[in-house]
UniProtKB/Swiss-Prot annotation:
ATP binds at G39, E40, N41, G42, A43, G44, K45, S46. The gene is rbsA. Keywords: ATP-binding, Cell inner membrane, Cell membrane, Membrane, Nucleotide-binding, Repeat, Sugar transport, Translocase, Transport. GO terms for molecular function: ABC-type D-ribose transporter activity; ATP binding; ATP hydrolysis activity. Disulfide bonds: none annotated. Its EC number is 7.5.2.7. Belongs to the ABC transporter superfamily. Ribose importer (TC 3.A.1.2.1) family. Gene3D superfamilies: P-loop containing nucleotide triphosphate hydrolases (3.40.50.300). This is Ribose import ATP-binding protein RbsA. CDD domains: ABC_Carb_Monos_I, ABC_Carb_Monos_II. InterPro entries: AAA+_ATPase, ABC_carbohydrate_import_ATPase, ABC_transporter-like_ATP-bd, ABC_transporter-like_CS, P-loop_NTPase. It is an enzyme of class 7 (translocase). The keyword Membrane applies.
Amino acid sequence: MTGDVILQISNLTKSFGPVKALKGVDFELRRGEIHAIAGENGAGKSTLMNIIDGILQPDSGEIRLDGTPVEIPSPAAAQKMGIGFVHQEIALCPDVSVAENIFMAATNSSRSFLMDYKGIEAKAREVFAQLSSIDPSVLVRDLSISNQQLVEIAKALTLDCRVLILDEPTAALTEAEAQVLFKIMRRLADQGISLIYISHRMVEIFDNCDRVSVFRDGRYVTTQDVAKITPADVVRAMVGREIGDLYPEKQRPEACSTTEVLRVENLCEAERFHDVSFSLHKGEILGFAGLIGAGRSEIAKGVCALEGQVTGRLWLNGEPLALRDYQDSIDAGIVYLSEDRKGDGVFLDMSIASNVSALKVEQVASALGLIQPGREIEQADRLGRKLNLKCGTLQDPVSSLSGGNQQKVALAKMLSVNPRLIFLDEPTRGVDVGAKAEIYRILRDLAEEGAGIVVISSELPELIGLCDRVLVIHEGCLSGEVSGPDMTEENIMHLASGTQQGTGAASVAAQ
C-alpha cells in the first residue's frame, strides 16, 4: 500500500426528500490499498458508493480523483475515469458468453462505433490468466456464482480500472471461493489498484483489509488501520454504543428441559445425507455446523419435507409424524427459513402485510376465500411489533426495507402459522451487527416461549455465541456434537473437516 491518495471526498451531502442520507461525509482512498467500509444498514454506505460510481449525484461537496476535482455524471463516466463497481447482485447477461459480457462493457465505455474485439478478447484472456482459468467462450449461466463474480471483476479490469468497489462480494460464496477472492484482491492491490470493500463480516475486514472507515447515520465517524484496532472498536463506532450483549444469555445447564420437541431417527436421502439422528429439547437453540456442501441445509429441508425421497422417522412433541410435503410440514407447525432471503424468503415487490400472510393466506381470508385487508394488516402489525420491525407503512414493498428488516418480515411470515419448530438457514446473512443482535434476541425469546429453534450458519462465532448445542455435519453424516466449554471453533472445525470423530464431550448425542 502506498501513501498517495487516489480518491478524496470532502463534505459530501445527499438528501432524498426530507431524508438526509449523507451529512457532510469525508473519505479518502490510497493507491494500492484495500479499504473497508463498515456501518449499519442505513449508515450511508450504499449512497456514497453510488455517488462514486455516478449512479447518484451529490447535493454538495467535492470529489477529487488523483488530486483533480471531478464530476461523475453516470456509471459510464465512472468507467472512463477508471472506477469499477461489482454489485452484490450479479449484473451479467446469462445467455451470452463471458467474452460477450466483457465486450458489452467495453462497448458502453467506448466512443468508437467500431470495437476492437480481438483486442478486448486478448485483454480478457490476460485478465483471466491472473484471476482464474475461466474460458471466455463459456456461457455465463453455466458458471458458478463465484466465477460470475470474477467475470464482474474482469469487466472492470479490462477497462483499466484503478478504483474497484466490491459490495458484499462473499455473500454467496463458499469459504474456499472466498479465500480465492481474497488472494485476487491482494494481488490487485499489489499491482496498484485501490479497492473499496463493503462487508458486515468483521473477520473478512480484519483478515484482508488495510484500513477501515466507519459510517453512522449518514455521517463519517472514523478511519483506522485495522492493525491498530479491534472488531469491538469498529462495532462500537458503527452503533455508537457498546454491544457487550450481542448474544442473549443461554439456558443454564440446570434449567435445560429434557422434554423433546423433535426427535429424528435414521434420516436418509440418496447421496445427500445418511442415517442422521438427533433430538431437540424444549427451550433449546440447536446449531448445525459444517463445511459448505456437507448437507446441513439438506438435512433441515429433509425434516421439513422439502427434499425428495427422504426416509427415516420423526417425532414432534413425542408424537410420530409423517410428512408428505411442505404443506404437511406447515400444518404440523414445522417451518424452514431459506438462506436465500431474496429468492425464497420474501417477495420483494409485494407489501409487507402480504408477505407476512403468504404462508397461510386462509388465516386472513373470508369464508369465501377472499383476502381481508384488515385482517392482513392486523396480523402483520402484531408480528411486526413483536419483532420490532422498522418500516414506513405495512403497505410498503419489502424491497424498501433494509436487509435486517427484510429478514424480520421473512421471520414474521414463519411466525404467522404459530410454528412449534423453526429451521433458520443463515438467518443473519447480509444484515448489520445491530440487526444481528435483535435477531439473536428474537430467537432466544421464541425458544423460551417453547418453540424449537435450529440455526444453520457458516459463522462459527454465531453458532458458539447463540446455540446451546451444535451438531457438526461432515459429508452428509453427523460427525459430532459440541456443547458447553467444548464448543470451540477448533473442535467444530476438526469435526467438520473429518479430522476428528466425536468422542466424549464432542460427540454425537446418544440417541
